[in-house]
């Protein structure tokens, strides 16, 4: 600072002055004016003293030492003694200066106010003793509110602890940081955990820490809690729980459950509810001692609701009770030895592995000793339907046809395998007769055949099917129309016939053999004697001749020739080639039909061509041959033949054209002659018509000249007649108009009088109605007045005046009285007696009332 000699120190301020001779600093406080000496130096400008307001404090580093009277101690040289490295907490007091060496470590700070449900975690830095006890360095304790904490230099505030609010159905989980006693004076070891469930604010102890806030699990009649013990302990009810033990807590135990610190919530278990048509199988059920019975089962039937205990599980879940109708059954197998009743009610012993069957109608829930193998239903079968059944004990297979059948416990459905070509033919669904010309149709998706169903095939009319039984080693032929049902060991005989044109082998696959009549077409190549090679397209009509269809030997002949089409075509072609090879082309061209028919059918004893060609091996008969086309194989021969044919056609065409032209010219001449004659005839007719027209014109002129005068006279007469008729009609119309006008006026007057009468009637009715209503109102008013006043009151009012007058007259001695005033009633009580003189003097009566 500047070297000023005079320093004015305001009140509550101070300066530090350094004596440069002794190198000692001192404090000068105001208010004063300080004159600096030459050997002194002011270290700083005047500074305000430290003022600690109420409920505040400050911390002084290296404080000065004071005696018992709180006076500052100085050493021998006049330097203030300091407690170096120490601290002093100063509370509210008079303003004070800082001596040289003192430092304001913590400025003016409000005292810590500890609220309710709050505490300060304190730790002793040095050994100390206060009103609450003695503490050594390292001790920890709580300063609980409400209150104001006065800090001390030996104590450190570690943290502020807030109370934890415990609500309903809540608890806090505490852990001990070291050995201590909890709020309930129970000893706790380091690391121990426990729960506090008391509702309200809980302030943890100094060695307690809040691990978690645990919410209670609300239990209902449909929910339970699965608990597992993580450590051996005793529960709240005193029961011992071992490590790993599991149990359920239900609503019967408590409505809201807070798990213990050594309890682990495995999960929430929902109630299992069974209705009257359900059951379940519990695996490893818990016994009466509460322990699971491993490897055992228990069946529970509805109606029932229960919780699965820990370790229990449902086998296949909740299952429906088997409700069997009359056409259903269950195949059962015994898993253990059990006593049972058969269908007749007899006691039987079932051994493990035994199979039996129960039939409906019944409601069945299998016990644990029984296993349901399969549920059987009766298979409905028509007369033409069947199934293959195999006995699993003997292995025999049989076919059941034409009746509904339910498999027994020792039977099963057997699948019959068929060759692939047979499967294809059966699945194609083609009609053997209508679709016989189709070779390869579009591939259609067909459902796979049920191999357990009996294989059936409908044999069409006039067809045959051969079935071979491999077990009996014999065959049978079925003629249509018929339905073939294959037995377990039977197979169809598949025909492989030649097809297409020319014939190729193995083109047609068929199960049934058509007996005809039918035809087949083939193309063969022949060569004449002059080496002319020709191609002929022929069609043969054929059929099978069967005399006795019931004869198995004759019926089996049909299938002795595997490919009767190919064999027949080859035999016929061979005969034709042999016959044609011996004739010239010209002869064959002229007599092709006779040569081919004679070659095919042959001649009888009379040298006539036979009617048919018979194959004795299978009774096939060819009845006719149709030659469709004959073409040379050689191209030059074909061209020459075609050219000659075209030339012949051209010559024929020209001849026909000339003939047609000549005929057309002849017809044209005839038409022209007829036309000319018609024209002449028409001219003659026209001249005749012209003559008649001239005659009519002359007659018309005569009539016109004489008819003008006649027409004028007739018109005048007609005009006069029309005028007279008009006058008559006008007079008639005028009279009718007057009559109509008179009638209209009369009708108007009648309606006016009628309306006036109706108006008067309505008015009179309204007057009458008004009078009646007024009378009713008066009557009602009078009745209500009478009812309101009362009949007794009216009577008293009516009799009050006359009675007083009678009493007054009697008092005057008058024996007869007649009052004829219109406004008062007449007293006739004693008038008649008075006139006759019979009235006695009135006795002196004592007045009543």
UniProtKB/Swiss-Prot annotation:
Checking Gene3D superfamilies in the record gives: 2.30.30.560, 2.30.30.570, 2.30.30.620, 6.10.250.720, 6.20.380.10, Band 7 domain (3.30.479.30), Major Vault Protein repeat (2.30.30.550)
Where are MVP repeat segments found? 2-55, 56-110, 111-162, 163-215, 216-270, 271-321, 322-378, 379-454, 455-517
Region of interest: Disordered: 430-452
Subcellular location, in the record's words?
Cytoplasm; Nucleus
InterPro entries on file? Band_7/SPFH_dom_sf, MVP, MVP_rep_dom, MVP_rep_sf, MVP_shoulder, Vault_2, Vault_2_sf, Vault_3
Q: Which Pfam families would you find in this protein's record?
A: MVP_shoulder, Vault, Vault_2, Vault_3, Vault_4
Name of the protein: Major vault protein
